[in-house]
Amino acid sequence: MASCLSLLVAIILCFSSLQCSNAIGKGYRLISMEKSPDDGSFIGYLQVKQSNKIYGSDITILRLFINYRTDHRLRVHITDAKKQRWEVPYNLLRREQPPNVIGKSRKSPVTVQEISGPELILIFTVDPFSFAVRRRSNGETIFNTSSSDESFGEMVFKDQYLEISTSLPKDASLYGFGENSQANGIKLVPNEPYTLFTEDVSAFNLNTDLYGSHPVYMDLRNVSGKAYAHSVLLLNSHGMDVFYRGDSLTYKVIGGVFDFYFFAGPSPLNVVDQYTSLIGRPAPMPYWSLGFHQCRWGYRNVSVVKDVVDNYQKAKIPLDVIWNDADYMDGYKDFTLDLVNFPHAKLLSFLDRIHKMGMKYVVIKDPGIGVNASYGVYQRGMASDVFIKYEGKPFLAQVWPGPVYFPDFLNPKTVSWWGDEIRRFHELVPIDGLWIDMNEINATGHKASLGFKTIPTSAYHYNGVREYDAHSIYGFSEAIATHKALLAVQGKRPFILSRSTFVGSGQYAAHWTGDNQGTWQSLQVSISTMLNFGIFGVPMVGSDICGFFPPTPEELCNRWIEVGAFYPFSRDHADYYAPRKELYQWGTVAESARNALGMRYKLLPFLYTLNYEAHMSGAPIARPLFFSFPEFTECYGLSKQFLLGSSLMISPVLEQGKTQVEALFPPGSWYHMFDMTQVVVSKNGRLFTLPAPFNVVNVHLYQNAILPMQQVVAFPAGASEGYASGKLFLDDDELPEMKLGNGKSTYIDFYASVGNESVKIWSQVKEGQFALSQGLVIEKVIVLGLKGTWKVSEILLNGSSISNETKTIEVSSKEQMYVVGSEDEGESKSFMVELKGLEMLVGKDFNISWKMASTNVLSMAGNEVIAR
């Protein structure tokens, strides 16, 4: 839902001027360093070299805390040695807390200048103090605060101004620092400031700070032909500007501490695994949330919502979740129902109907609570004293209901009150998920600079915490409270969609990218933003398909669903004032939707398995190509294509009037998912121009992968290797936890190989009872990329000849045509073989093999197994 206003707010601390930095501070000297006998951590003290009053007084003595919590994670924490400073609350983002004893600085001799970990080595200089982080494996320096080359100033640490810089190699590729609408793609652009301060600035504005704050970046470098990735997190919730100059990076922060975490990687997947092991693994999502969602601000009554559901059915476009924006509320008041337009009995009848169809219902909640003496939610909130204060009273703001107070989610009483209100509403309306919006916080009706469209930075939270300090964690704290409430009320796996996010939000909520435009540029930017959030640990992400506002041309909506069908979170949503944009509004768009969403629904088991991988290791669902091809430097800046998982590549049309797409194909064989007779082969990796008429989206599966699908499990393997592997996770998706060992989940490893004139496909099942209880079977096998002949003989199923089985197996084949680069050599065609009628139980190990009639079989370029 849009806010009342859309204005650009920027925090300008100091423009990227070297003179400005040098004038601010002269740095610190290290005066002591000691090793803790308990855990091997180090504690040191720093003394300011020369104090001044620019931006306030320097903090005289700082405490330095260093530790290695894992083999691949280093922490460097710098704070005031004499006074406790604000940090992201340890009860919200759980992590090790440095010693909290504030004492006098010691002046013991500094006897070490290097602290070694298994992979990351910390090196520091004494005067002026600086530190560098170096890899043990290749000697590469990944972070270096020394200003010896005078490209930036010394470290500055004042009460309301902190500054620190690092040098960088000019060929480093950086990603992250969001949420930001990056018009130039996912790769950070030198000489652009990146502001981090959660605010309600719509994504209409490009290259600007948006709803979330994620002060983390990934650095990908190619060192002598080998790729190394690492990540750096500055865990700080204050507003900050980050200046990237190509050869250096400077942080300018308006408070808090320096709390740096370094993650060694070395692969991009290693990095997100290490990062999410600290900030929290992404939340497991219910299976239904991976279906298609429809929403609009302006579904003004139950009949309109019912018509939308009916029209999707008539158009034969899949729809799993219907949403209501604030239209269902009484006067925009949270936890209320407009009994005129949404009569309780009529709404319950509608929900009963869609629930029987397997559909779900999600509604919006804004944090602002209407100030109304007859409003029970307000009354109970006042009685429990749950609102943010200003000058001793609840802060009065203006949002949709009129005058509002904002809940203080740092207050334990607020969390309890919020949970009780959700319980009460759920008893009234059996919702399946919640959408928490405008939680940056968004507010209007007062004058401020930094606090414009939010609450004053001098407002305060529980225990006297200033809004100045806690502003950017508001949406995060609300997501935690909402997750706790839904879990308690439903006893099921919660689904929450949040606009504002912070470090760790992915542990509790999905995210959509806010109020975007119905423009071609917004379509392009949606991919970059989606890929960034995978790096941030929020893999369940998507943008408003067809754009939130203004009117969207038919051609654009046509192309947008071809992209949006492959967002991890796939939802069509539009503004109240925009024309209707449901996918059935245009004939050509409906056809594209049936095609693209039809493929998405086939991919649901695959997407759900990616959801499991994300929950277990932080692996993004949607990924940049460099995650799978880190040595292929041509894809480092690629933002117009993306991968789902490690091997499924989407290459959409993103420009008006185009009926073909120029796509980059990393080295190997790629199989078209919509027409498996088409194969793209590139020996060294290159651009290919592919046809892309309306209703066609280029989706390709890479060699050596196994792809579990609805009715299909695909096994492509490489022409040179003849081996493929993959996996499938199944469970009761209502369980709060997503894991093996609970008796209600199954995990399958699939394998396939070609050799000695035979093809073999087999599985290894862990805890198969759940899959057996669901009656799931593999019905069809398709093998792609066979050389020589398609003729199949001597089919064996679990060691027995298929002729001994009572089932009838159908065998068919098609020729595959290759698109081969002009510089490449090799075969120009192959064969795909399909076996139907297998009915192999998913919950039991299976082994199927057959002989090929020709001796010309060389290897398997790809294969596919289909499960029903």
Curated annotation (Swiss-Prot):
What SUPFAM superfamilies does its record include? (Trans)glycosidases, Galactose mutarotase-like, Glycosyl hydrolase domain
If you read the UniProt record, what top EC class would you report for this enzyme, in one word?
Answer: hydrolase
* Pfam families the UniProt entry points to: Gal_mutarotas_2, Glyco_hydro_31_2nd, Glyco_hydro_31_3rd
Q: What is its EC number?
A: 3.2.1.177
Which UniProt keywords are given for this protein, alphabetically ordered? Apoplast, Carbohydrate metabolism, Cell wall, Cell wall biogenesis/degradation, Glycoprotein, Glycosidase, Hydrolase, Polysaccharide degradation, Secreted, Signal
Q: Where is the active site?
A: 437, 440, 515 (proton donor)
Q: Does the keyword Lyase apply?
A: no
Query: What are the glycosylated positions?
Result: 144, 222, 301, 372, 442, 756, 798, 804, 847
Q: Which GO terms describe its molecular function?
A: alpha-D-xyloside xylohydrolase; carbohydrate binding
Kindly state which reaction or reactions the protein catalyses.
Answer: Hydrolysis of terminal, non-reducing alpha-D-xylose residues with release of alpha-D-xylose
UniProt GO cellular component terms: apoplast; cytosol; plasmodesma
Q: Which InterPro entries match?
A: Gal_mutarotase_sf_dom (IPR011013), Glyco_hydro_31_AS (IPR030458), Glyco_hydro_31_C (IPR048395), Glyco_hydro_31_N_dom (IPR025887), Glyco_hydro_31_TIM (IPR000322), Glyco_hydro_b (IPR013780), Glycoside_hydrolase_SF (IPR017853)
Cellular localisation: Secreted, Cell wall; Secreted, Extracellular space, Apoplast
Give the residue range of the signal peptide: 1-23
Query: Which PROSITE patterns does the entry link to?
Result: GLYCOSYL_HYDROL_F31_1 (PS00129)
Question: What GO terms describe the biological role, i.e. biological process, of this protein?
Answer: cell wall organization; polysaccharide catabolic process
Q: State the family it belongs to.
A: Belongs to the glycosyl hydrolase 31 family.
**Name of this chain's protein:** Putative alpha-xylosidase 2
Natural source organism: Arabidopsis thaliana (Mouse-ear cress)
Q: What is the lineage of its organism?
A: Eukaryota, Viridiplantae, Streptophyta, Embryophyta, Tracheophyta
This protein's gene is called: XYL2
